[in-house]
Each structure stands twice: as C-alpha cells, then as structure tokens.
Amino acid sequence: MSTVLYRCPELLIGGEWRPGRHEQRLVVRNPATGEPLDELRLASADDLQLALQTTQQAFEHWRQVPAHERCARLERGVARLRENTERIAHLLTLEQGKTLAEARMECAMAADLIKWYAEEARRVYGRVIPARLPNSRMEVFKFPVGPVAAFSPWNFPLVLSARKLGGAIAAGCSIVLKAAEETPASVAAMVDCLNQELPPGVVQLLYGVPAEVSQALIASPVVRKVTFTGSVPVGRHLAELSARHLKRITLELGGHAPVIVCGDADIARTVNLMVQHKFRNAGQACLAPTRFFVDRRIYGDFVDAFGATQALRVGAGMAAETQMGPVASARRQAAVQDLIARSVAAGARPVASAVPEAGYFVAPTLLADVPLDAPVMSEEPFGPVACAVPFDSLDQAIAQANHNPYGLAGYLFTDSAKAILAVSERLEVGSLAVNGMGVSVPEAPFGGVKDSGYGSESGTEGMEAFLDTKFMHYVA
C-alpha cells in the first residue's frame, strides 16, 4: 500500500498553480480497484486563453536565453526529477496501474530523455555556405519555431510528455502541455520539477475537455508547432486541424508491432525477451510486440514456451510480487476483452490465465493459430494480447507483417545475415530491433510510417522538429 497522499493537481499557467475554472470535473480512478482517487478540475476557455497569452510572453524571453543556460536549467530540473522519483512513481502506479518497478523505470527514462535534450541544446549548429560573390557570405541559422502545443497520452505519461517537454524547452520554445486526464498527478509532479528551474510561462500544464483544448490551442496564431502522441483517429483529426491553420505537426500514433521469428532463433531467449516486452504496462504500449510470425518448424515449441505467460503474477501494481498490473480503465478492459472474443470466434485458439475479479484486469493472453483475417491481426490490441501465426518462407512472413496499416516498430530474431538484410530493407516500420528489444532510446529518432504517423521524436531529428531554418546572404 502506498503512503503517498494522492491529490489531483491544479493547472500550471504563467508559472503559478491555479484551479481549473471549467464547470465540468473528472474522477480519477485507481485501475487496480476501480475506486475513485480524486476529482480533477479542468481548464475553462478563459484558462486556455490565459495560457496562450503567457506562453507567447515567455517565448519572447526564453528564445533569447543562451543555449548553455537553457541546458543548465533543464539539468537542474532533471536533478529534481531524480530526487523525487519514489514519490512520482507511487503517484503513477496509483493512477495508471503499472507496477511500481515499471513506474520507477519510467521516471528514470523521462529524466534521461530530458537530460539528453538539455545537452543537445548546445549542439544546434548552423552552417556557412561558400559564397557566389566576392565580399559576401551565405549562412544558415537554426532558431526556435515558437510556442508549442503538445498532447500526451496516459499509457506512458512521463516518458511521452518528456519527449515533448525536453525538445521544445531545449530548443528555446515555450510549451503548453495538455496531458492525459487519466494520469494527472504524476505528470504534474514531473512538470513541477522543471518549472522550479524555468522562467514563468516557459512550461504550462493543462487538463481539460480534449476537443475544447485542441481547438483553442491549434487555432490560435500564438501556437507555431503541434506534437501529439495517441490514437490514429485523434491524430487524423489534429492533422486536419493543424493543416487548416498551417501548423507543423509531429504525430506518433498507434502500432501493431510484428515479430518475425526465424527457424534458427533461440526459442527460450526470444520468448523470455518478448514476454517481458509484450506484457510490460499490461501491453499498453504502441511499440509492444503483438503479431508473432514464427517459422513453422519451431512454431509448436514457440507456442508452448510462450504459454508460460500463464505463470505471470497479475495484481495491483503496488504489490512487490506483481509482474503485470491492470489495464488503465474499464473502457480499455472492455475493448481488449471484446477483441479477444471476436478473434476467438474467428478461429483463434486462446491460451490465458486467471486474474483478480476487482479492478480493470485482463489476463495475459496468447492467441495461437490465428486466421489472417481475424480482428486481432488488423486492430491494435493495446492490451496484454499477443497472436501467433506460422510461416513457411521469409517472403511470406514479411508480406504478412506488412499487411497492416500500422508501421511503428518491428522485431526480428535470427542469426542469418541474409534474413537481417531482407527484413531491414522491406519491413515497413520506423524502428527495427534485431535479436533484442531496444527500439526507443533518447539519442535515436523514434517515429512511424503509414498510419503510425509522421515526424520523429528523440535523436537529433526530434530536436529539429522544434527548430526553423533561416538563410542569410550578406553582401558587404
């Protein structure tokens, strides 16, 4: 049981925490029990306009702050974040459901992301182009794009907010973050660590009615850049809204990651890695391995080994023995259970275990012998569900893996150089891990293709997303 007192946060506007003035309030619940934790007060139209006004004012100052000072301020904020890891992790587990170990890891990952961006602030370089005329110079400059509107989800609220906060602030932008209403306290605690080291208004945090917030922020001439992580339908809507107002947008959307397991793969090692990765955060990860295409020669052994997921200890995230917590909400629980039922009706064979009755729990489930037209092969589960299909040739596996609108992450297990070359060139994903799990690190770009979005976060590409380019030709 956590000893951390849970309270829903206020809004951060202009460097001050203030209550939201919207007439509507939302109840935040503990996914492990379904019981209410507190009520969240939302941003009103006046709150949104005040946030826009103050973010514009803050940007005019922050853009002129030298990169070395921006770096130092962010690094001090990161130090505060690390000092508060235990408290923030407890808040995250209470409101989101993931295990305490996973919550601690997420805090560490968020700190690493912001620190990397802080260091990158000192490495934003322009360039000199050889001039065409005597007594002249041609130069290219990089400068901050302007105030940013950022939208982050509930599944990894710290990490996915940190990707946006770190890049925008390091680049010299101010940022208005609309974080997920399901997980408000943990993000507010992280943002507070940064805010204490920044000038007022550089970072602002809002919670509100999503349609009202997105319309107000994206339509405003103050906002110059939009960044969103979330579902494909919402991403499409925000892309249309951004296009209408000619705003640059980065979209990191859904995933349905394929895993190709070749005949020479080490089954025990592959299953051990993939079970850890698949059922982390109860499978609520856009890069979670989900569709397993397994060489027919080892398919039976693979399914038997994967069936050991029934031994995973499912329970409340605060319990030390828990290996997988609940899904985040009753709505998510119902959606995952419905997808399993429809896929079983289509011919899939379920391998699952029992789970606690109270709370929003879904059993870690493997669907074996899945028909290619079963719903789970095309719909993102976003829960603790994996599906397995045998293949007879690598060409067949690649074709089946690509037969899906998503293209975020993919995985390959083999020692064959020929197979690695073929999959790396032909698998339609933004990130590929070979014989491992690492597809998301601060120093490398992360983003998808097809319906998984466009643009990158993290890496130098993620920093570029918050920068504009100016060319100057000077003749003496």
UniProtKB/Swiss-Prot annotation:
Keyword NADP attached: yes
Binding site for NAD(+): W154, N155, K178, A179, A180, E181, G230, S231, L253, E380
PROSITE patterns (alphabetical): ALDEHYDE_DEHYDR_CYS (PS00070)
Entry keyword NADP: yes
Gene3D superfamilies in the record: Aldehyde Dehydrogenase, Chain A, domain 1, Aldehyde Dehydrogenase, Chain A, domain 2
Catalytic EC class: oxidoreductase
Residues annotated as the enzyme's active site: E252, C286
Family: Belongs to the aldehyde dehydrogenase family.
Protein name: 4-(hydroxymethyl)benzenesulfonate dehydrogenase TsaD1
Species of the source: Comamonas testosteroni
Source taxonomy: Bacteria, Pseudomonadati, Pseudomonadota, Betaproteobacteria, Burkholderiales
Gene expressing this chain: tsaD1
